[in-house]
A protein has these predicted regions:
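Residue-level signal for beta-strand positions within conserved beta-sheet cores that form or flank
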Residues: 51, 104, 245-247
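Structural signature of FAD isoalloxazine-binding scaffolds in flavoprotein oxidoreductases
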Residues: 18-37, 91-121, 136-143
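Gly/Ser/Thr-rich helix-start
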Residues: 13-15, 24-27, 59, 82-89, ...
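Phosphate/pyrophosphate- and phosphate-bearing ligand-binding catalytic cores of soluble enzymes
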Residues: 13, 17, 111-256
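Hydrophobic, well-ordered secondary-structure segments
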Residues: 61, 65, 79, 83-87, ...
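Anion-binding (especially nucleotide phosphate/pyrophosphate-binding) glycine-rich loop
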Residues: 1-86
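Short Pro/Gly-enriched beta-strand edge/turn motifs at strand-loop
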Residues: 89-92, 127
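Short coil/turn segments at secondary-structure junctions
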Residues: 47-48, 92, 219-220
Length: 256
C-alpha cells in the first residue's frame, strides 16, 4: 500500500478514534483473530516472581487481564477495563489508576516505516504521556512483551473488580464515547479545567460534555463527527481564554 501511495490505517478495537462524517478514503486494516493471542515466555511455576508475557497487537486488554488473573499473574490490573487492544495501548502508552504501559513494557515488535520488522526496547519506543515513537510515525505494532509478576488470583480479581466499580461510578459508561477526550496538560487536570470553565453539560448537536465526568465528550444519541469537533474546538477555546492552558486531543481523528 505504501509503494502504491494508498492511504491506510491500522486499528485494533477502534475505541479511541473519531472518524470523519465523510469516512476515510483508504484501507482500514483491523488486527483481528490472527493477532489476539498471548503466551508466557517464562515458566510461571519457577522460583522467580517475575513473569514475561508476549501478547499480540489485537489482543483486547480486558480479555488479557482476565486471563492473566485466572493464571495468578498480577501487574496488569490497571489496564483491565480499558476498552482497547495491546497495539493501541503501546502506541498511546495507555494508562489508568496510577499505572501506564511504560511500567510493564519490555519491548514491542513493529513494522517500521520502511516495512522492516524490528524489535524495539521500551527505551527505543520513547514512551511518554499518551504517546510513543509509534504514534509519531507510521509504525505498526505486531506484539508486545510485558514484565508482570506472580500473585494470588482472588486478590487480582478483587483489584480488577474494584477498578471496574470506580470506572462505573466516575465515567459516563452509559453513553457512547471515544474515551477520555483530552490529554492531561502538565500541572493540570483537563476535566477540572473544563468543569471550572462551566462547560459541564455543554453541547453541540448530539455531542455533549458529560455531566458525570467533564473529561468525556459523549454521544447523546445522534452526534456527528462535526458535532464533536465543534464542541472540542469550543472547549479548547474557552479553557485557553479562561485559564491560558492549551488542551490537546487524546482522541485520534481519522479522515479529516
Amino acid at each position: 500500500m505504501k509503494k502504491s501511495d494508498i492511504k491506510y490505517i491500522v486499528i485494533g478495537n477502534g475505541s479511541n478514534i473519531l472518524v470523519s462524517d465523510e469516512g476515510f478514503r483508504g484501507v482500514v486494516v483491523e488486527l483481528g483473530d490472527g493477532f489476539s493471542d498471548y503466551e508466557f515466555l517464562q515458566d510461571s511455576q519457577d522460583n522467580s516472581d517475575e513473569v514475561l508475557v508476549k501478547a499480540s497487537a489485537g489482543m483486547k486488554l480486558t480479555r488479557l487481564g482476565n486471563q492473566l488473573a485466572a493464571n495468578g499473574i498480577a501487574g496488569f490490573e490497571f489496564a483491565t477495563g480499558i476498552p482497547g487492544c495491546i497495539g493501541g495501548a503501546v502506541r498511546m502508552n495507555a494508562g489508568a489508576y496510577g499505572g501506564e504501559f511504560k511500567d510493564i513494557l519490555v519491548s514491542a515488535k513493529v513494522i517500521d516505516d520502511e516495512g522492516v520488522i524490528r524489535e524495539l526496547s521500551a527505551d527505543e519506543l520513547e514512551l511518554g504521556y499518551r504517546t510513543s515513537i509509534v504514534a509519531k510515525s507510521n509504525m505498526i505494532v505486531l506484539e508486545a512483551t510485558l514484565k508482570l509478576r506472580k500473585g494470588e488470583p482472588d486478590i487480582i480479581r478483587n483489584n480488577i473488580s474494584e477498578l471496574a466499580a470506580k470506572r462505573r461510578q466516575k465515567q459516563p459508561l452509559e453513553y457512547p464515547s471515544a474515551g477520555s477526550t483530552f490529554k492531561r496538560p502538565e500541572g493540570y487536570f483537563a476535566a477540572k479545567l473544563i468543569e471550572d470553565a462551566g462547560l459541564k453539560g455543554c453541547a453541540r448537536g448530539g455531542a455533549q460534555v458529560s455531566e458525570k465526568h467533564a473529561g468525556f465528550v459523549v454521544n447523546k444519541g445522534d452526534a456527528t463527527a462535526k458535532d464533536v469537533c465543534e464542541l472540542t474546538d469550543y472547549i479548547k477555546s474557552e479553557v485557553m481564554e479562561k485559564f491560558g492552558v492549551g488542551l490537546e486531543l487524546e482522541v485520534v481523528k481519522v479522515g479529516f
